[in-house]
Regions:
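Conserved C-terminal RecA-like helicase domain
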Residues: 5-114, 128
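Conserved RecA-like P-loop NTPase helicase motor core
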Residues: 76-177
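Residues forming the flavin
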Residues: 183
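The feature captures the C-terminal accessory region of ATP-dependent helicases
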Residues: 186-191
Length: 191
């Protein structure tokens, strides 16, 4: 499911995306004990630490989850050092021992990040990822977790990132975002 917000307020987009993810995937556990995860790209460490983390912490508490289900993953700066054990938590995201549900990211995870249990992505503002990487970043959540089983995913975008995604889909796959969204009407079984 691709959701495009007409709001320019990044906080509003993130709040709606997190709530929709938790409403639909909070209790989702895939084969092998992998819990569904949501990735939120934040653009800057300060935004992650000062805006997104407090917002997401409040929302998960409303859903009966603790802050231990949120991973802040960035390389740190002078004001906000890299969170303790975050690299280890990131490395085990796709293992049954990981209980992380929401991953907050800054400039990480766009290349070579293969997390099958990633079920949703939020790109709420321009600059959350490089302009030429919107397709690759937003489609991180489209990997099959259990072979042959029907699965869904959530991609939450602001209008800027939706336009970039549409352009990149047309350039690289010769389809529009509208065709991409309607793809679930023509389901195929992957072998």
């Amino acid at each position: 499911v691709v959701k495009i917000s007409d709001s320019t307020d990044s906080v509003h987009i993130i709040e709606n995306g997190v709530r929709e993810f938790l409403d639909n995937y909070k209790d989702t556990v895939y084969g092998g004990g992998l819990v569904a995860k949501l990735g939120i790209y934040c653009g800057k460490i300060e935004k992650l630490e000062e805006v997104v983390y407090p917002l997401v912490s409040r929302i998960v508490a409303e859903y009966g989850l603790g802050t231990d289900t949120i991973l802040k993953f960035h390389k740190g700066n002078k004001q906000y050092p890299m969170p303790a054990d975050s690299q280890m938590q990131f490395d085990i995201l796709d293992k049954s021992i990981s209980k992380i549900r929401i991953v907050l990211l800054v400039q990480i995870g766009k290349e070579g990040w293969d997390c099958r249990s990633l079920t949703g992505i939020i790109l709420s503002q321009e600059g959350d990822c490089p302009k030429n990487m919107v397709l690759q970043t937003s489609c991180r959540c489209l990997r099959q977790v259990v072979k042959g089983m029907p699965e869904t995913a959530l991609i939450y975008l602001n209008e800027f990132n939706a336009e970039k995604l549409n352009t990149q889909l047309q350039q690289q796959h010769h389809i529009s975002l509208k065709e991409f969204e309607s793809g679930n009407d023509k389901r195929i079984t992957l072998k």
